[in-house]
Design a protein with these regions (language model features):
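N-terminal secretory signal peptides
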Residues: 1-16, 23-34
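Structural motif
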Residues: 187-192, 232-236, 276-280, 320-324, ...
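Multi-bladed beta-propeller domains
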Residues: 195-212, 238-256, 282-300, 326-342, ...
Length: 440
């Protein structure tokens, strides 16, 4: 039986991930401002990976006098990646200037050691330094130093974690990247930009009407989103640096589910301007939309392949929501998902190897991961209301929304599902995450 197409007005009563799909079927804005209530995130890491690098992160000299505990932030970042296991340092503080006795750390089964210092300068800024040691080979792997204002202390810790991650794994770290997400507290919705661990949240938009589908531009300079402040879905682009926004799509009917092309020149979105919900290409500068799909069904939730050659999307053309792909210019449509009767919310890994999506199994909505080379997929969560998956820019982690203990929260997971970190705020529900790109 062909599924009934819901009324777009029902969007307000739906949870985030399904909300995006249903929107396809159918405030005030200012410069980013830090909001302390939502900066108080709690990160809880659980699970044990099959292979983890043991690292000792000594307390940084002067860390006790710093408003931010640099060593603790670095350790939390590395543990959240799923690739590192912290070795007990017994409260030792070691700075970057002297060579440590590495035999002590070998006895503690550490493969590497991070030391450092935090110094407050006379002008109020901070000098943050670190040094990384290969305990097994007895080698100095180099260090980093930053002279920064107090407000950038957390960023310096994330950059140190990036440095350690890249030195020890050979891949870029993602800890200094940003995520966007939406919160609902009482009747108000907020769009936020935050550090990758959810801290340092800054408000981009607040509205009494729903905000959905935030999508980072390839450079991280802009954030597209859908706002219902005009009592219908309208797509805007928010400039992260200036806080200004501009209209991208306000055609007749619904305008939803924006997705940036990898070159940043255009977006693909779902419009109902000609009746049914179809995919259209829209110039990044705004302007006339070009229709890409020509079906009598519902086509929505577009996502570009990282090489820009394909657009993955959700369609009910086969009788139930499934994931398809087509050429970036339209045409040559082929089905991607065949297991399960309800598959939505496609997200492509930046390395092009993986497709994350939400599959309904019985009455549960679960995050699945497909190996695009093999066409095989597995469920990687034990929750039952998963939504809105988005890959980290190094393709090693996925952030998604789910429901736990009666609230919507954000989780990150490794691709094997072994290590998860739960990000919860002080109040309200957190939904619609999108992980930003590497900073350029």
């Amino acid at each position: 039986m062909h599924p009934k197409k819901p009324d777009p007005s029902s969007i307000q009563s739906l949870s985030a991930g399904r909300r995006s799909f249903i929107a396809g079927l159918t405030g005030s804005l200012g410069v980013l401002a830090v909001q302390p209530a939502w900066a108080q995130f709690r990160v809880e890491v659980s699970g044990v990976g099959l292979t983890q690098l043991p690292i000792a992160i000594a307390g940084f000299r002067g860390d006790a006098q710093s408003p931010q505990k640099i060593a603790a932030i670095v350790q939390a970042d590395l543990e959240r990646s799923g690739q590192f296991r912290a070795v007990d340092t017994a409260g030792q503080n070691l700075d970057e200037n002297s060579r440590p006795d590495l035999s002590v750390w070998r006895q503690r089964a550490a493969d590497s050691l991070l030391t450092g210092s935090v110094t407050r300068l006379a002008d109020g800024r901070f000098d943050v330094r670190c040094r990384l040691w290969d305990v097994v080979r007895g080698q100095d792997l180099g260090g980093q130093s930053y002279v920064i204002p107090q407000g950038d202390l957390r960023l310096s810790a994330h950059r140190i974690a990036d440095f350690v991650y890249e030195k020890l794994t050979g891949e870029k770290g993602i800890f200094s990247t940003r995520i966007a997400y939406v919160t609902k507290v009482g009747p108000r919705y907020n769009l936020w930009v935050a550090d990758s661990d959810g801290e340092g949240a800054q408000s981009a938009l607040t509205s009494p009407e729903p905000i959905i589908s935030p999508a980072w531009s390839p450079t991280g300079a802009q954030l597209a989103y859908v706002s219902f402040e005009s009592r219908k879905p309208v797509i805007y682009a928010h400039d992260v640096a200036s806080g200004k926004r501009r209209l991208l799509a306000n055609f007749r009917g619904s305008n939803s589910a924006p997705a940036w092309a990898p070159n940043g020149n255009q977006l693909v979105a779902t419009l109902s301007r000609d009746g049914g919900s179809q995919l259209y290409a829209i110039p990044a500068t705004g302007g006339e939309a070009r229709r890409l799909t020509q079906s009598a069904s519902i086509d929505t939730e577009p996502a570009f392949s990282p090489d820009g050659k394909y657009v993955y999307f959700v369609s009910d053309r086969g009788g139930s929501p499934q994931i398809y792909r087509m050429g970036a210019g339209g045409g040559n449509v082929e089905r991607v998902t065949f297991t399960g009767s309800y598959n939505i919310s496609p997200a492509l890994s930046p390395d092009g190897r993986w497709l994350a999506y939400i599959s309904r199994i019985g009455g549960a909505f679960k995050l699945h991961l497909m190996d695009l080379g093999k066409g095989t997929a597995i469920s990687i969560t034990d929750t039952s209301a998963d939504e809105s998956p988005s890959f980290a820019p190094n393709s090693r982690l996925i952030v998604y929304a789910t429901q736990q203990q009666g609230r919507e929260a954000l989780l990150t997971t490794t691709l094997d599902g072994k290590i998860k970190a739960r990000l919860t705020g002080a109040a309200g529900d957190i939904r619609e995450p999108d992980w930003g790109p590497f900073q350029r």
